[in-house]
């Protein structure tokens, strides 16, 4: 049975190899080639770098999407040039060919199944016939005016200037403005200058951006410049801004920046995740920002000294924070702030909260006791990170008794008890070991923990040692490795 299923596939493969042996013939008969032959023939031409064949195949591609990114694990500028040349030939025609189907050039590595399906790797569950049925609606010819071709790629800017691939596509899209849209669901800028970043934002189709991360929001003027583009990103789901504390501003300038940014948030009706990391522009004005959120957030991260008393006080007030699934207030210097507002917020989101980060917040026993009743009601909590705080053995015992009922917890981190530290705050392992055993005994009286860490430990997500960087947010909440 297996031979009978695989044999036709093998014959198609051999036919494709034979056809590519005569490049002129292959090009001449593409219009009559069965669509089942296109994917294996394209893979063969791609592997053997028959660039002229690829160029012509793009023009006759019989599917709505060409998932080139899953074939090209690393960008190949030569092949990209030939593919774009083929598309240009199509776009230059006033009357589109009969077999015109291509609507999307996918440069992300997201659709490897397409090639395995058509190469026969899964002939039973995903046959060409089944694939054809799924694409019936997509393959229907469009009527009316020509739709722009969409080119999908993610943008990660780690240098001050664009790399060759991005520069090439940026120039091509600008040349073909109106007929080609550069769509980037994710745009990340680590270090590119504001001028070059502006050029990128002017090229990318703004409605396509769903995730935007800016790690160098250091210039006040960048907020104003950036806001103009941000307001056009109507489908933005995640916004991350970092490092905006390099310059001190006058109160008038700060109020102007807050007003500018608040007006932008009013336009982002689909925003679900907001991360503000080491940004001082908004300190003391969080109320104004939260008030402008159009829809409930799933994730709120305000980290590295962002919060003041007035900021924390406003958090429980607004409906936009009533359905939080993730909350991160790490490195927030909460030692001198009353935590009753945090308790009120935890009570409000007790039914939805899944992840809570209160890392290195300066929370001592008296502050901890304020939030414990609310914390014990967060029945869906799966991750709780509390390490880096100044907590005694009695405080940790009380904390574990309150979290003992949280049966969904799969990851929890706690500081070493104060009694196990020396005068410099370093852990004395001989003291920590028996205290840790006692804490585990107390917890096991109510539930069996899954992953639990006390004191300085390696990150359970990536293994990085916190002796160098005590941040658990670099895996789940911060900059990727």
UniProtKB/Swiss-Prot annotation:
The yes or no answer to whether the keyword Repeat is present is yes
What does UniProt give as GO cellular component?
Answer: Cul2-RING ubiquitin ligase complex; cytoplasm
**MF annotations from Gene Ontology:** ubiquitin-like ligase-substrate adaptor activity
> Could you tell me the keywords of this UniProt record?
Leucine-rich repeat, Repeat
Where are LRR repeat segments found?
Answer: 99-126, 181-205, 206-232, 233-267, 268-293, 294-325, 326-344, 350-377, 378-402
The biological process GO terms on file are: negative regulation of apoptotic process; negative regulation of cell differentiation; negative regulation of DNA-templated transcription; positive regulation of cell population proliferation; proteasome-mediated ubiquitin-dependent protein catabolic process
Similarity comment: Belongs to the PRAME family.
Protein's recorded name: PRAME family member 22
Q: Give the originating organism.
A: Homo sapiens
Name of the encoding gene: PRAMEF22
């Amino acid at each position: 049975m297996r031979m009978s299923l695989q044999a036709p596939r093998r014959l198609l493969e051999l036919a494709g190899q034979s056809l590519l042996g005569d490049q002129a013939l292959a090009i001449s008969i593409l219009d009559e080639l069965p669509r089942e032959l296109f994917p294996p023939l394209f893979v063969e031409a791609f592997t053997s770098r028959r660039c002229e064949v690829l160029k012509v195949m793009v023009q006759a591609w019989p599917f709505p999407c060409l998932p080139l990114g899953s074939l090209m694990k690393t960008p190949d500028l030569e092949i990209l040039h030939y593919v774009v040349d083929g598309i240009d030939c199509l776009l230059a025609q006033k009357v589109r060919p009969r077999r015109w189907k291509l609507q999307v050039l996918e440069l992300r590595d997201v659709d490897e199944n397409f090639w395995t399906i058509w190469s026969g790797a899964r002939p039973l569950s995903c046959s060409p016939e089944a694939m054809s049925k799924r694409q019936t609606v997509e393959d229907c010819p469009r009527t009316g005016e020509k739709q722009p071709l969409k080119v999908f790629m993610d943008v990660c800017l780690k240098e001050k200037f664009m790399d060759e691939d991005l520069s090439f596509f940026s120039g091509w899209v600008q040349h073909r403005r109106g007929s080609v849209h550069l769509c980037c669901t994710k745009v990340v800028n680590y270090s590119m200058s504001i001028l070059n970043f502006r050029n990128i934002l002017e090229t990318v189709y703004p409605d396509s951006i769903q995730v935007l991360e800016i790690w160098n929001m250091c210039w006040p003027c960048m907020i104003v410049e950036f806001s103009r583009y941000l307001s056009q990103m109507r489908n933005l789901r995640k916004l991350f801004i970092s490092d905006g504390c390099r310059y001190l501003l006058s109160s008038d300038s700060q109020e102007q920046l807050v007003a500018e940014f608040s007006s932008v948030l009013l336009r982002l009706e689909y925003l679900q995740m907001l991360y503000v990391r080491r940004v001082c522009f908004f300190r003391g004005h969080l109320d104004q920002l939260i008030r402008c959120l159009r829809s409930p957030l799933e994730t709120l991260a305000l980290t590295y000294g962002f919060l003041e008393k007035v900021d924390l006080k406003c958090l429980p007030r607004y409906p936009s924070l009533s359905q939080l699934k993730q909350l991160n207030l790490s490195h927030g210097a909460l030692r001198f702030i009353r935590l009753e507002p945090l308790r009120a917020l935890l009570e409000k989101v007790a039914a939805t909260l899944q992840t809570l980060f209160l890392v290195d917040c300066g929370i001592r026993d008296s502050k901890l006791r304020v939030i414990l009743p609310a914390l014990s009601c967060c029945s869906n909590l799966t991750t709780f990170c509390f390490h880096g705080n100044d907590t005694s053995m009695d405080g940790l015992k009380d904390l574990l008794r309150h979290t003992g009922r949280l049966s969904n917890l799969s990851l929890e981190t706690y500081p070493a008890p104060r009694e196990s530290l020396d005068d410099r705050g370093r852990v004395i392992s001989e003291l920590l070991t028996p205290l840790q055993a006692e804490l585990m005994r107390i917890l096991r009286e109510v539930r069996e923990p899954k992953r639990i860490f006390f004191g300085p430990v390696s990150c359970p997500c990536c293994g990085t040692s916190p002796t160098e960087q005590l941040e658990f947010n670099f895996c789940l909440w911060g900059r990727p490795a």
